[in-house]
Amino acid sequence: MVRSSASLGEDLTMQDRLRFQTLDSYQVAKEIARRVHVAKISDSELRDQATRASKSCFLQLCEGLPSESAAMRRKYFVCANGSLHETVGAVDLAVTLGMMSEEHGDAIQALALRLKAMLWRLRR
């Protein structure tokens, strides 16, 4: 659980979060980034690429979700979608080359399919 620096020792509840942090797309993108990190891809370059892409996907989504401008939302969601595809490609390659477990790869792939559908709807 996230800790509030303003009130040390008190757990944040869903009511203490910004509205966009409660959305499924936010939670799924964050879980993808977490799983890429936990997967510990054995090749350092590919691990770095997958990690950066998954973080970029999450952060682009975070910039777009609270935006009130339709054009800016679309821009951020298109960028998040590109980073999501980069993440999936890096994970798929890592699994193919034996640099991470198929189990981790399958879990990330399943989450990516969910997020892809959400990003497509958010862009509209």
Ranges and model annotations:
Residues M1-R124:
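Amphipathic alpha-helical assembly/interaction segments
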